[in-house]
Amino acid sequence: MKFFEGFLHLNIRCSQQDLPAIEKFYGDVLGLKTGYRPNFNFSGIWLYDGEDPIIHVGARFPKGSFVKDKHSGSVDHIAFKASGAVDFRKRLKKLGIEFEEQNIENAGYQVFLYDPVGTKLEFNFLKEHVPDAVALGTVAGANMR
């Protein structure tokens, strides 16, 4: 019997003052919208992709306690399957978001960036390459060109 049915959501912790920046970031970068969230005993938002609340954000760090280099747990990054690499790259540049990118032979184009509270995000454009972005097999860091 199969019990695992797929990905449901990821959860990001932050402080209360980080909520607006996180909502704007994921709205601008991924087009996610704030939606229904149960009345928990802490502040937060749920960000929706259509009808699915795929990112839960909980304001559970006291004000000023978050350090971007702080490691909480064993998760290094969150990876997304993506499409439309050229347009996504243009969007990040327009928004002024720093990112690293690479073209990988037989694996596609990848973009790495951080959200406002330091969560590392990876976007995989599996069947795409962006030749003018970076040479095959190399990484371009802190790109805002």
Q: Model-flagged regions — what are they?
A:
Residues 56-58, 122:
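Conserved beta-strand in the GNAT
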Residues 12-54:
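Core segments of cupin and vicinal oxygen chelate
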Residues 42, 62-67, 99, 131-132:
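A short, acidic/glycine-rich surface segment
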Residues 59-62, 126:
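Acetyl-CoA-dependent GNAT
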